[in-house]
């Protein structure tokens, strides 16, 4: 077409760096190639210099939407690439329309979230999609509220101000380039790394996507050497140069990339005109060693873990709502196997992958709740970051799988009396922080000062004998220092004194307080809490410490902080004092998420410490680490989830049964994720002394933080209180969890939980749950300092099904309540069916912040004859540390009222301690 200007290519790039609200730096790069020289002059530059618009903007009223149209690589419906403001990452409908208008085209089409195509006519048989708008569903990169086509689909617009060409053609449009074209093969390169070679010219943008994974920024100085060097630096073994200035990296070619004729890789490199750097949708490919071309990716349907089955391509983000709630991002190794294994490990039976690198887990019921539907499979088109031959969804689309085998968990849903019941017990006189059952059958309540009621004494004793008579039920007691965030225990001395250590601030953090229980049910005592800070205190001040009775009868005090949100106290010490404190690096490293660490003596002779999301076994003499356990699992989408304060869950010991050959197990339920995220929805258990032991995960029916747990005399555990979101602290949790769960370790794993009755009272931060001597669970407290949830003085009881059944309780008498290890002791059964008798020993518990200090469940050996049962005490102090226990006799599931027995004596001679400060001493 002689005499007519033929502009091969014009590219305008805008880079704006704002220097102030009124001043900016604008860089304009204009690149042009001509078939005839000296014909075209750039009046545009003059316009730019005078502040004209950088890109001509189309009038929005002149564009008409035509619909969703078909497209295919190699036979494009629109033949020209549209160059847009901000490039593919900022693609919007308007940007594409403006780009096409600025190039003089009347048709504009957006595709695959990031592509803009222009022309004045439809080509290669392209037309309205046979499935309508279904596959034009991908959001625009620059505006997710708009649709930018899909795989092989264009959202097509026409500028009515420009008359399009009516002629259709099946031939490809002429290739327009930004550099002169030739048909020669690439110039041999020098200086490539050893083993690298030219592998040929290959097609890009085929079969629904790019054929190489990593796209580097465009370069105006690109050479083959520089492209290969950048890929080598990033760890890749394949490099591809495209369109003169683009460099791609990968370890193979994807999407069954077909080889093109060499003449199609004809654009010279922007940094070396003697080299060829691909062409439009053509790659000059270099590889280290042989080149691998992967097949077209498909959803993985074989080799799936467990009972997973492929279901199809599922919508996500319908009406801005995620289909599945838990997201895991894996930029390098997302596969169906990895994703689904994670989901089912944590008890989720629906899930899948999206956007190449994202894994989602949830339940089948989530799909309907989100309004998500299955769509044509081809719409899920992105390859997995960990498997380039498999599909992992697309934008807002999930490659969806469902667990089709036996259910991952079976939650029992009892009704009526079998679900238990909450009952109001009595109005309180304080908001308790610590509750402890005494061997006198009464329960001590202690509250913090400062934020507590101004007219209380900080401590009271509750006598259940008078639970119907408020005036007699509460006995006033007194403490001198603030027990806020202290730890508590029942000591193994012969009178079962109660101990609290640590506190809120100053001298309180060093506090050591003792109470000698006296009186009996219906008979008031006279003793009070005793402390003498000048004579007896901890070596280190501690806020949130743990106290534990060791196998030798001494008291181990571990961890804490210097005061409220203070520096860590990464030490441990022993009471009575036998030496200086010992530094523990693991306490310092995991602060502040390790407060109130979980501790227990182990039958093998050492000590288990579990804290934050870690656990280890300590030598009971040196406290050196002898074994590090696997990290404690957190949330399905967050390994940083933790179990100890402030990510507060609860640990208990699973029941021990004579002859005590089964390794001891521990159970931890609830917790949270850092920074006030979702609470954890699982329990985990482990037998720490078993070689190569792993944590077993059991999903709970609901999320729970600020968890409380109470062991019951039948060997089950009641899980209650807390919230579904947040962490421990004032005002840091929300969405109260009002339901109770019963955990029965005698049942198979993942079938142990029953959904029990609900309460109407939110039990949030600073709530407690503790087993009473009559088998009920006393539920108290809630002190979140949050206007959404009141300070809670009301005291409830949870009545397990064995209380509500109406069955008559067994009764017994006992003479000897001070047992030696391995000794045999007789009780007289005065009522009950001897053939159904079971006997349990429940450790005396002090409950605070979800902790159940002293919790232990033992089913000892026994034999019965003619109404007399002989019980064999546990064999040693590692199986059963010295201490006080509630002895229950059960007739089937129905427990007696407990008697209090001591096992193992007082080997640490705590009865003679402290010999200072005027403390009353019971002796040994």
From Swiss-Prot:
Transmembrane segments: none annotated. This is WSC domain-containing protein ARB_07867. Residues 1-24 form the signal peptide. The keyword Magnesium does not apply. It comes from Arthroderma benhamiae (strain ATCC MYA-4681 / CBS 112371). Keywords: Glycoprotein, Repeat, Secreted, Signal. Residues 166-190 are annotated as: Disordered. SMART domains: WSC. GO terms for cellular component: extracellular region. It is found in: Secreted. It comes from the Eukaryota. It holds the Pfam family GO-like_E_set. Glycans are attached at residues 90, 290, 333, 387, 455, 552, 758, 833. InterPro entries: Gal_Oxase/kelch_b-propeller (IPR011043), Gal_Oxidase_central_sf (IPR037293), Glyoxal_oxidase_N (IPR009880), GO-like_E_set (IPR015202), Ig-like_fold (IPR013783), Ig_E-set (IPR014756), WSC_carb-bd (IPR002889). Residues 62-160, 195-289, 307-404 form the WSC domain. Residues 169-189 have a biased composition (Low complexity). Its main location: secreted.
